[in-house]
Amino acid sequence: MSLSRISEVNINLWNRQKVQFTAYSDVNIIMGVNGSGKTTFLKNLYESLVAKNYEQSEDIVYLPSIDNIAMRDKRKTATALAQNLEYFIYDMKTGPSLMSLRMSMIDSSVEQQEELKARIADFQKTVNGLFALTRKRLEIEGSKFSVITDNGTLPVEALSSGEMQVLLILLRVFLLGKRESIVLIDEP
């Protein structure tokens, strides 16, 4: 069974507002003023999609916004982002991560190993292209995930919150592989 595409969107907000539109097959952007219900809409859409596609819910990804707690306490936001990023880089137990993907290479055929190495190299190249202006680059070697600068190696949590958020989004999409997927991003 393949994941159903979103063609018609029909979501109720707060039991009084109905949002309806015909969706494009590739990218759709929802815009509105603060408090207009964009985040609520995305949460409701995600829940609806998961309910309809329960067997393939791992192919439906919701990336919530990292709350603007940063204005009040930058440490909380940076910590939440860094923890989320560390999870998708290193977690070996509960979900897809870069390291679990690399470990899967051990039992893979030579052809599968080469394909995975090429995918990781493409991911690295994409991230490095985005980080080029800040003279940072990502290196993925074995179980090491490093951010390299002119002054040496940085821990992931030393990246700016914007850099961590971009890296997290790209990593989540990368971990989906070539599977048909739906990705909902709130305030990228």
Language-model features: locations:
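Phosphate-coordinating catalytic segments in nucleotide- and nucleic-acid-processing enzymes
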Residues: 1-13, 31, 40-158
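Conserved beta-strand position immediately N-terminal to the Walker
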Residues: 27-28
